[in-house]
Amino acid sequence: MKPPPSSICTGELINMINKFELHTDVLVVGSGPSGFAAAYTAAANGADVILVEQCGDVGGISTSGLMSHWTGSCESPLYYEILKRTSEKNEGKFKNEITNIIDPEKLKTLYLEMLDEVGCKLMLYTFAVDVICNGNKILGVTVINKSGKTDIYAKVTVDATGDGDVAARAGAEYILGRESDNKMQPATLMFKVGGVDCDRAIFLGSFESTYETPDGELQALAKEHIPYPAGHILTYKTTRPGVVTCNMTNAVDIDGTCADDLTKATLTCRRQMDDIVKYLREFVPGYENCFIISSASLIGIRETRHFKGKYTLNEQDILEAKTFDDYIVKDAYFNFDVHNITGAGLDKTGVQKHFKQTKGYTIPYRCLIPETKENLLLCGRNISGTHMAHSNFRVMPICVGIGEAAGSAAYICATQNRNLNEIDAKEIRKIIGI
């Protein structure tokens, strides 16, 4: 028997597979913390919701990305509920203890349980490949998975892809990365090590953290012994005995919207892991017998597209803790966190050191609305903001707050047949409870 022809191009293969059609009130693309929050909130309030996710788990960087902990904060009832319900699932000394430490396996299960409770339809292993438009009006998204292609028509589409893939394909205006040169923050592949003596272990949780040993200071030793562009130590406690999460790989000059660059970044980071473990064993107290037990299936992309919204949040807004009339996130707090775009550590220009947040700030609803597109909401780190402002609001708790707002707005618009631009932020805040 002759083998099937191998010259059929991808486009021809796609055209040969099954085609389906679905209709829903709200379509959320991407199930990271912001996408989960948007889908859960919209469904909990009574909207029919479909949540599309390319990975095999809900949670994005918080689960598939093996994130160590929730960092940053905002006033978000849903975020607090996640922490509370996670504590109930934790075991041992962390049982019923509210902590920002993440157990990715427990969190995966919790996300699924919560979505099931509110009747959200979930489509895993599914990629958004095109946008269905009528002029500037977004009608839905075309997705593809093992079953074939599906046109999903929605009254409101929420882009929670992190990179703004839906908005970009719809033609929404954006810039990549830093305004001056379009360079973006580096990528990281998280991993965990076991065999750690946690009673003796050193945990350095920031680039500014240092620790002197007989062999030298640990950050300096990391720069010396871990090959560039890695060269720092960031280690975090877990809820598991003897297990530590490492945020220590580093890939620079990466465009997270480019598949080739994502592959390159993954290979770069994975090749660094053995050298990192060797460094930990040789120089860091408590890690003498450590070994890799797991690594992320999703690489951590910190920055890609910044969209032009009805309003673009800037660093001065954050520094002044401006209270916008149309705020939908309040008391957002983090530091300006620009990782070194050319190597390990923080941005070598030190520019973020000139920006010190003193109190919580607000995010206006207008940042979620692309300037020229209808029926589409930006959600999570791809809302409208400058490079520097983005380095502050990109963290997961703040993204959960943004997701709650997006889900609330989508619910109102879809179930009351209203335009996203007509919604008063007070209505959104009332639903969220802030």
Name every feature range the model reports, one short phrase each:
Residues 3:
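Cationic, low-complexity basic patches in intrinsically disordered or flexible, solvent-exposed regions
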Residues 10-15, 41, 47-48, 52-134, ...:
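Conserved N-terminal/central alpha/beta ligand/cofactor-binding core
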Residues 20-32:
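Beta1/beta-strand and adjacent pyrophosphate-binding region of the FAD-binding site
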Residues 26-28, 49, 376:
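Conserved hydrophobic helix-helix packing surfaces used for dimerization/oligomerization
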Residues 27-29, 38, 43, 136-137:
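Membrane-embedded transmembrane-helix bundle of lipid-linked glycan/lipid transferases
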Residues 35:
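N-terminal Rossmann-fold NAD(P) dinucleotide-binding loop
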Residues 61, 82, 125, 145, ...:
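Flavin (FAD/FMN)-binding glycine-rich loop and adjacent Rossmann-like elements that form
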Residues 132-151:
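Conserved beta-strand-loop-beta-strand element in the redox core of flavoprotein oxidoreductases
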